[in-house]
Amino acid sequence: MRRLWDGVLHAVVLLLAAWVMALAFPRTDWSLTPWAALVPLLALATIRSPRTAFLWGWASGTLFFAVLLRWLQFTFQVYSAIPWPLMYGPVLLLAAYCGVWTGAVAWAVSWLTARRSAALALALAPFLWVAAEWLRGHLFGGFPWGTLGYSQYLRVRVIQIAELAGVHGVSFVLVAVNAALAGCVVLRWRQALAGVGATAVLLAGTLAFGSVRLAEAPPATAAPITIVQPSIEQPLKWEPRHTQETLGIYFALLRRVADEHPALVVWPETAAPTILRNDPALVERFRAAAANVGAPMLLGSIDVVNGRFRNTAFLITEAGIVGRYDKIQLVPFGEFVPLSRVLGFVRSWAQFIAELEAGSRAVVFNGPPAPFGVVICYEGIFPDLFREFVRDGAVLMVNMTNDAWFGRTSGPEQHLAMYPFRAVEHRVSIVRAANTGVSAFITPTGVIVRRLHLFERGVMTESVPLRARRTLFTRLGDWLGLLSLAVTTAAVAGTWRRVEPAAVGSV
């Protein structure tokens, strides 16, 4: 009976911790919770068998992602033909897949405890966690949503280490603190004290580095840039009867832009209500607007190349269309169907599934105001792709997106929360234009200085600092993710042939 009650208590604590950790992300932003929310899982993994630890980790990870990704249910409810009892299925399946990686970390901690020691397992826990995040962000096209470090996007002093090690550097510090606290529960006091001491040094270094970077003067060169947020409801965006009303909203907003004297005007993803290059009259209107405002227009539109549709950003000046970038990283089950021959039937289930062709290369526009790159929609949540633009010479980055599919849920806010890390990783300003929000200006220190909120129609202009230096992350990329993968592989492989002690419990 006692074992049963212990199991119930463990389940309650683990699942409560997972639920609370999900609330660290927008909109609740309880950003302190990840500093301790993994303690129950890590501690339990050191006293349970690898199989049991995996199951507990998978269950807690699945709950974490189910809570975090609950906003996706809105999209399925409004824009799909999936019967309501089944519309939670896609979210739960995705959560269950992502939860596997949490289970893998718990399994590895238990395995290393059994083969070596709990002290070593907890010391390696930050590497195990980052390796799992790296794999989740790369395998099968990658899904890095919910990376633990993103929970700290408002704690600007903490996230400055992203310049050195990316968002995974912040995840590493968070898990190190959790592992040290778990050590206080399961280790002898000398071992626990050593772990706390090492983690204290790591945390102090993180905060000290952040303080130094935040005290530095901003880049000397800046340029005024305007964001337009038209706030067109998704059902109306492609409605032919609404096209003229949409354009009326656009050009009414543009009349407010001329007084701002910007160097660049940024519109959202697929802002053009028609296929732009097939609509010479619309191209001419934007060309004339660029001439009137005295600044280029960066405009999102669907385009057709050799009979295939693409998601494109066009640069329009008084000379017409002078540049383009075609989106490279397409959204699975949004812009294409993976394994189309097998899963193609899902196209009939949802309005939001398109069949687009991916672009082939990153493009850096020459400006004005300076060389800049564009990531479209969720391309910016992939650090490797974002880095390509900066390495190719971009000193300013633009994100154009259309998060209207997610309504007034937490989805658009969670999407925004990832971009402060891209800014810090490369010390580059980010100009983010979203159809229905959240549009924002983000400084090279990751501070969101101005924003237009969800479904707020308007324009805003800000003097945007231009990148002045290359960072370690720009030069080396996600070295910590690769190092963590190597450490994890070596640790598990190195213990594979050792005999597992019988002392580790099986339940």
Where do the language-model regions lie?
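Soluble catalytic domains of enzymes that build or remodel membrane lipids, polysaccharides, and related
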Residues: V212-L476, L480
